[in-house]
């Protein structure tokens, strides 16, 4: 997994791959991937944009993934959040293609919701599952590979809540 914490570190990752595989091979073949997180709502910071440009120029894959907490950073409805996820992913994909047409890109999504009483994030909820499934359907229709998050929970103990949330969030990720 390539570094995305600063564009120069992304370039270091590409350069290390060039040492391992050969520079020409790396330019012709995808040998690594990176995870570009979008700061929802609809914010691409300079660090992520710079790293995305480095990987696109080098023909290396980038997972373009919004980090969305429904009800806090996105609409509370499934349809509203799904719309935002797709808009953010397509913005990242488009930028990557402007940098290098044909650059490999993977659509991603990290979606959860918020407890409107406490403000705490919730995991393994039906809403997050619907958004994750919906995103997968939409990006597959667009011909993009898809990656989603899973196997996380908000429980403080290894208890029934942890098991339920982990299982449900893992299931939607599969």
Which role fits each region the language model picked out?
Residues 1-174:
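Helix-rich catalytic cores of soluble enzyme domains
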């Amino acid at each position: 997994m390539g570094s995305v914490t600063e564009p120069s570190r992304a370039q270091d990752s590409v350069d290390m791959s060039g040492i391992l595989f050969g520079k020409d091979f790396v330019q012709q073949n995808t040998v690594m991937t990176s995870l570009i997180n979008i700061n929802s709502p609809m914010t691409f910071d300079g660090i992520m944009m710079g790293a995305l440009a480095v990987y696109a120029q080098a023909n290396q894959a980038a997972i373009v993934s919004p980090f969305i907490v429904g009800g806090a950073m996105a609409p509370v409805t499934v349809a509203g959040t799904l719309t935002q996820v797709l808009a953010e992913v397509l913005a990242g994909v488009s930028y990557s293609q402007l940098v290098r047409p044909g650059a490999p890109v993977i659509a991603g999504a990290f979606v959860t919701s918020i407890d409107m009483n406490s403000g705490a994030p919730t995991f393994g909820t039906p809403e997050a599952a619907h958004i994750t499934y919906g995103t997968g359907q939409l990006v597959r229709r667009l011909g993009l590979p898809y990656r989603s998050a899973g196997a996380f929970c908000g429980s403080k103990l290894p208890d029934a809540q942890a098991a339920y949330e982990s299982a449900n969030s893992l299931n939607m990720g599969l």
